[in-house]
Amino acid sequence: MTIDNRPVLDPRTQWFLQFLKDLGRPQVWEVTVDQARAMQVKGQELFPVTKMPAQVDDRIIPVGPRGTVQIRILRPEGVTGILPVVMYFHGGGWVLGDAGTYDRFLRDITNATGAAVVFVEYRRSPEETFPVPLEECYAAAKWVAEHGAEINVDGSRMAVAGDSAGGNMATVVCHLAKQRGGPRILAQALLYPATANPGYGSQSCRDFGQGYYLTDEAMNWFWRQYVPDAANDTDPTAVPLFAPLDQLKDLPPALIITAECDVLRDEGEAYARNLSQAGVPTTCTRYLGAIHGFMGVNALAETPTAIAATAQMNAMLKKALSDKAAVLPQQSAYV
């Protein structure tokens, strides 16, 4: 008897992929950007989900290369004290995604961790390109660290999190915080992060480039919306996988979650290995039978993998924000 290592998709995931195929929706590059964004919103709304109660506050802060950044602050309902904070940077290929499409997921995080969640509505591509969205994410994190009292959070107890393109920017915000002397970040949670450029040529890209939700063609298109100038394709602030080990040293402890059937799987795991090699406390978990976006897509919210991965992320964030002693001494060097 031989062991069969071929991926087996979760039944709900199989159904979801067939549903999308039967729907016959156009590829993201075949429609206008506004139409693509509307398609994503509709895709989330098609699947009603239970949402945890939360306090929600939208505001505009005076930072960033364009002068202002919009944020949404979520807190557990009825909680009035000063809370630690999770800065959340959303995915969607730098093109799609907003606070509305992430509402269910953000409410889960704030209730499970007991932390406030600050969701950054960075200006999306192609209207704004690298490095503007990244700099807006960094500027928002810096503002929250310095002005936490204005939004009733403890800016000295901050973690960052993000998925896909947002996972890219979440970890690069940690790079910038180290390089620029702050803010202090206690942990980073990266969910199926985009860490390389489309030329990386991984095995997972070859194996899952078609038919598994995020295609290699779509990822190439998303990348060029964010980084239109190929001269930036190896810049570590766009491509964190290419960062030298000394740049990774002393970054915050990391949790990286990958999906087995995802074009971005291998680059996320390669980045985890780089972090570990640089001495960063790193946990990387691959969820079998899962596809890209499985934690945030409403249609997959009740799958065993989404439930387990979300619980793992929330437990890590809660511990990091409640136990300062768990942070290695050298990681306070860029306070």
Where are these regions (language model features)?
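Gly/Ala-rich beta-loop-alpha elbow adjacent to hydrolase catalytic centers
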Residues: 162, 166, 170
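Short amphipathic alpha-helix adjacent to the substrate-entry channel of hydrolases
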Residues: 100-119
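A glycine/proline-hinged amphipathic helix-loop "lid/cap" segment
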Residues: 1-73, 232, 304, 315, ...
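Gly/Ser-rich "nucleophile elbow"/oxyanion-hole loop immediately N-terminal to the catalytic nucleophile
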Residues: 145-160, 180
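Alpha/beta-hydrolase active-site loop
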Residues: 128-150, 313
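Short beta-strand element of the alpha/beta-hydrolase
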Residues: 82-92
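Short beta-strand-to-loop junctions in surface cap/lid or active-site-entrance loops
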Residues: 64-65, 71-82, 241-248
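Alpha/beta hydrolase fold serine-hydrolase catalytic domain that processes acyl esters and thioesters
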Residues: 155-156, 171-335
